[in-house]
Amino acid sequence: MLDFYNSWYASIQHEEHPFLKKMRIYSVLRFCIRVLANITIPIYYVLTINNKKYSLLGGELKSGRIIVTLTSFPARVNRLWLVIESLLRQSHKPDMIILWLSKDQFSNLDLLPRSLLKLRKRGLQIFLREGDLRSYKKFFYTLSEYPNDVMITVDDDIFYPTFTIEELLKESLKYSFPVVVSRYFSAITQDNLGNCLPYIEWKQLTDKSRDKIFFWFRWWNFIPSGGIV
């Protein structure tokens, strides 16, 4: 279901009809898709939550593991389970999913919503740390404690299509050095006066350009073993 919405949304983003764009028809359509997705995807997740294939298997690897890492804060934690669900449903499952939280914001795990805590049975690991490194938590602690593993950092407010990890791993094989890659890219766009336009108005790069410019990511970032952002 998520992949369907993703494909639908992307097809509208690539439309360039001047009149429809000026009338903001595409913006309205994209808004409707986002609303519909935010209503139906949670329902679908709840109805299929007991499917065993949507859990991490666990393994014997001690290094070279694929670790998905993220962090969050109180304003977003209630819907964070949806992000985790999308990660548990990947076509190429990670070995670990780690959520790093600050004790300044969550003094103990009991303060977290049940919807999130229940995901520990399916492979989610949650760690509390002193202080607050903000968004840097998701890679600082992972690099410190799992230096020999592959790290994929994700955000706490995005539904990730099932092919996310699979495509990142395939893309990483093209490069022999630590690199940040993504599936979608946007080019910084200016108006006629040279002023930078809002991000939502930046033009997406063509497929030919994407092969040359791989450091500007939109959805996720990927760091091979030993890599640093």
Q: What is the predicted function of each stretch?
A:
Residues 148-159:
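Short beta-strand-to-loop acidic/aromatic patch adjacent to the donor-nucleotide binding site
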Residues 2-89:
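N-proximal low-complexity "stem/linker" segments adjacent to membrane-targeting elements
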Residues 95-96, 150:
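Residues at the starts of beta-strands that form the adenosine-phosphate
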Residues 98-102, 182:
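Short internal beta-strands
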Residues 68-70, 99, 153:
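Structural beta-sheet core signal
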